[in-house]
Amino acid sequence: MGVPQGDVEKGKKIFVQRCAQCHTVEAGGKHKTGPNLHGLFGRKTGQAPGFSYTDANKSKGITWDENTLFIYLENPKKYIPGTKMVFAGLKKPEERADLIAYLKESTK
């Protein structure tokens, strides 16, 4: 199917409103309730150094990319049962695409 083209600025607003309470994106950023997301693309689930993940996250074994994030962000607990991420998800495809566009820019 492919991920729709997202808007980085809209994605940044979504991140600030819905994600920044638990996640940071900058290199060397601290882990909060959730892991720092720097270097997310191309990394396997449950692999951010120094963050305590659930076994479910560590054993999922997928690599984060646009497609896996697009599915995950719709309903995290359905995609990784047992994750400690409490976020219910983004149901609108365009919001997920915007957030992914922002994450691609901000986590490199």
From Swiss-Prot:
Which SUPFAM superfamilies does this one have?
Cytochrome c (SSF46626)
Keywords from the named record? Electron transport, Heme, Iron, Metal-binding, Mitochondrion, Respiratory chain, Transport
**Matching PROSITE patterns, A to Z?**
CYTC
**What GO MF terms are annotated?**
electron transfer activity; heme binding; metal ion binding
Q: Which Pfam families match?
A: Cytochrom_C
Superkingdom field = Eukaryota
Q: Give the UniProt subcellular location, in the record's own words.
A: Mitochondrion intermembrane space
Which Gene Ontology terms of cellular component type are present?
Answer: mitochondrial intermembrane space
Q: Identify the residues that bind heme c.
A: C19, C22, H23, M85
Residues in the signal sequence: none
Q: What is its main location?
A: mitochondrion
InterPro entries the UniProt entry points to: Cyt_c-like_dom, Cyt_c-like_dom_sf, Cyt_c_1A/1B
PTM note: Binds 1 heme c group covalently per subunit.
Q: What does this protein do?
A: Electron carrier protein. The oxidized form of the cytochrome c heme group can accept an electron from the heme group of the cytochrome c1 subunit of cytochrome reductase. Cytochrome c then transfers this electron to the cytochrome oxidase complex, the final protein carrier in the mitochondrial electron-transport chain.
Q: Which family does it belong to?
A: Belongs to the cytochrome c family.
**What protein is this chain from?**
Cytochrome c
